[in-house]
């Protein structure tokens, strides 16, 4: 009769071998292929990156050459811009001064017109008040005490109106 431990041992070995075969076939092989593909992809990316770096270096050199050539042109443009700036500032100052003078003249004219209107309005109000006071005085025959009270009352009214 066979020892049960030996059978278990042999079955365990067989199971391990079957598991190893299955892992190798379905896990290790695809992972190995994936790793190889990934390695090739990384290698290709590194080669592409090196080519792009070299091309970028060439472009950088061309850029610096153009930059060196453009410095004198830039200085000339800056000088022209400064001259134009000074001209614009001078023109703006002249325009601002002219506008300010015009605004002051218009403001003075408006003030004069408003002053004339105010004086005319006051004259009209004083005239109306004088007429009202005269009418009341003539309509009311009163003694001196009542007259004083009436004048004070009218003066208070005039004070409120103005």
From Swiss-Prot:
InterPro entries assigned: ATP_synth_B-like_membr_sf (IPR028987), ATP_synth_b/b'su_bac/chlpt (IPR002146), ATP_synth_F0_bsu_bac (IPR005864), ATP_synthase_B_chain (IPR050059)
Function (record text): F(1)F(0) ATP synthase produces ATP from ADP in the presence of a proton or sodium gradient. F-type ATPases consist of two structural domains, F(1) containing the extramembraneous catalytic core and F(0) containing the membrane proton channel, linked together by a central stalk and a peripheral stalk. During catalysis, ATP synthesis in the catalytic domain of F(1) is coupled via a rotary mechanism of the central stalk subunits to proton translocation. Component of the F(0) channel, it forms part of the peripheral stalk, linking F(1) to F(0).
The keyword Ion transport is annotated on this UniProt entry: yes
UniProt name for this protein: ATP synthase subunit b
Family: Belongs to the ATPase B chain family.
Record field: transmembrane: 6-28
Membrane topology per record: Single-pass membrane protein
Oligomeric and partner information: F-type ATPases have 2 components, F(1) - the catalytic core - and F(0) - the membrane proton channel. F(1) has five subunits: alpha(3), beta(3), gamma(1), delta(1), epsilon(1). F(0) has three main subunits: a(1), b(2) and c(10-14). The alpha and beta chains form an alternating ring which encloses part of the gamma chain. F(1) is attached to F(0) by a central stalk formed by the gamma and epsilon chains, while a peripheral stalk is formed by the delta and b chains.
Subcellular localization, as worded in the UniProt entry: Cell membrane
Primary localisation category: membrane
Pfam families, per database record: ATP-synt_B
Annotated Gene Ontology cellular component terms: plasma membrane; proton-transporting ATP synthase complex
Classification via Gene3D superfamilies: F1F0 ATP synthase subunit B, membrane domain (1.20.5.620)
MF-aspect GO terms: proton-transporting ATP synthase activity, rotational mechanism; proton-transporting ATPase activity, rotational mechanism
Top-level taxon in the UniProt lineage: Bacteria
Keywords for the protein's UniProt record, in alphabetical order: ATP synthesis, Cell membrane, CF(0), Hydrogen ion transport, Ion transport, Membrane, Transmembrane, Transmembrane helix, Transport
């Amino acid at each position: 009769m066979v020892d049960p431990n030996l059978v278990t041992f042999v079955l365990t070995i067989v199971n391990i071998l079957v598991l190893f075969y299955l892992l190798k076939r379905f896990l290790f092989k695809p992972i190995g292929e994936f790793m190889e593909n990934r390695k090739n992809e990384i290698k290709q990316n590194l080669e592409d990156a090196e080519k792009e770096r070299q091309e970028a270096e060439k472009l950088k050199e061309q850029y610096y050459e153009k930059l060196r050539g453009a410095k004198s042109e830039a200085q000339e443009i800056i000088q022209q811009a400064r001259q134009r700036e000074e001209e614009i500032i001078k023109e703006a100052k002249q325009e601002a001064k002219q506008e300010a003078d015009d605004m002051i003249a218009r403001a003075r004219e408006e003030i004069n017109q408003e002053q004339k209107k105010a004086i005319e309005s006051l004259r009209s109000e004083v005239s109306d008040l004088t007429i009202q006071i005269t009418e009341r005085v003539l309509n009311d025959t009163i003694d001196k005490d009542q007259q004083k009270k009436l004048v004070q009352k009218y003066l208070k009214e005039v004070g409120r109106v103005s």
